[in-house]
Design a protein with these regions (language model features):
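A cross-family phosphate/adenosyl-ligand binding-site feature
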Residues: 3-53, 58-59
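Alpha-helix C-terminal capping segments
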Residues: 51-57, 84-95
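Glycine/threonine-rich flexible loop motifs
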Residues: 71-80
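Short beta-strand segments
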Residues: 6, 65-68, 98-100, 139-143, ...
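Electrostatically charged, flexible surface regions
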Residues: 111-240
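Glycine-rich phosphate/pyrophosphate-binding loops
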Residues: 90-115
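Short glycine-rich anion-binding loops that position phosphate/pyrophosphate groups of nucleotides
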Residues: 10, 43-44, 68-71, 145, ...
């Protein structure tokens, strides 16, 4: 059985949200094909938490987030509401996957959701059968092409995203400034073995992402630092 609990609006670039400052609303809706679903005014990660905490009456076996209409590659995973919803599932100990379509200026005329759905339908049973390591999710990016045009699967690492953000300053009718973060669409380095490289080669990219963000290679170096005595300033600031 597939149960749907999703945001009622766009949460692009929302990151990992946990709404604690206001109540969350959930309402029954119908999808375009008549499928019953639940919609919430919370973020994608809120929706996963709501489902796990009891909005859905049955135990949850697996979390699927997406299909996002833009790729989530490289550093995008820290911004993405789609990926962080899967992260929320992994926090709860559930096998979790995020699916995104690689729409860009060259292929944005048609969104091939049917391709991404076919990819998800093939991958989800494999995750159910094989499982995932604890606190690991799969970030899946699919070329925005017909299924017949895809060259296959590629297990990848996160690539290097290149952002082209710029500050756009405007003034309201009262002369007060306001700002947009604008700029051109991000690009990336299509290096071999990366999610960006896989998409450039028309492969489905499957990237295991872990919740542990510790930079283990930096630990020994940091342990060699001579950290100052935390009490030295306090003692020197006391009057005689």
């Amino acid at each position: 059985k597939v149960s749907v609990l999703a945001p009622d609006r766009n949460w692009s670039a929302s990151g990992h949200v946990k709404t604690l400052h206001r109540p969350l609303r959930v309402k029954e809706v119908q999808l375009a094909d008549g499928t019953p679903a639940l919609a919430s005014d919370g973020a994608p990660s809120d929706c996963v938490a709501l489902a796990v905490l009891g909005i859905l009456p049955e135990p949850i076996d697996l979390v699927v987030s997406g299909i996002n209409p833009n790729a989530n590659v490289g550093h995008d995973v820290t911004y993405s509401g789609t990926v962080t919803a899967a992260m929320e599932g992994a926090i709860w100990g559930l096998p979790s996957l995020a699916f995104s379509l690689d729409r860009n200026e060259e292929n944005n005329h048609t969104l091939h959701y049917e391709t991404a759905a076919a990819v998800a339908a093939r991958l989800v049973p494999m995750v159910i059968q094989n499982g995932l390591p604890p606190h690991v999710l799969l970030n899946v990016n699919i070329p925005n092409q017909p299924l017949s045009a895809l060259r296959g699967w590629m297990v990848t690492r996160l690539g290097l995203r290149i952002y082209r953000d710029e500050l756009i300053r405007r003034e309201d009718p009262r002369g007060k400034p306001y700002y947009w973060i604008g700029g051109d669409e991000p690009t990336g380095l299509p290096e071999e073995g990366t999610d960006i490289g896989a998409l450039a080669g028309n492969y489905v990219s499957v990237t295991p992402v872990q919740l542990d963000l510790t930079a283990y290679q930096a630990l020994d170096g940091l342990r060699g630092w001579q950290f100052p005595d935390l009490n030295s300033h306090k003692e020197s600031s006391n009057p005689p």
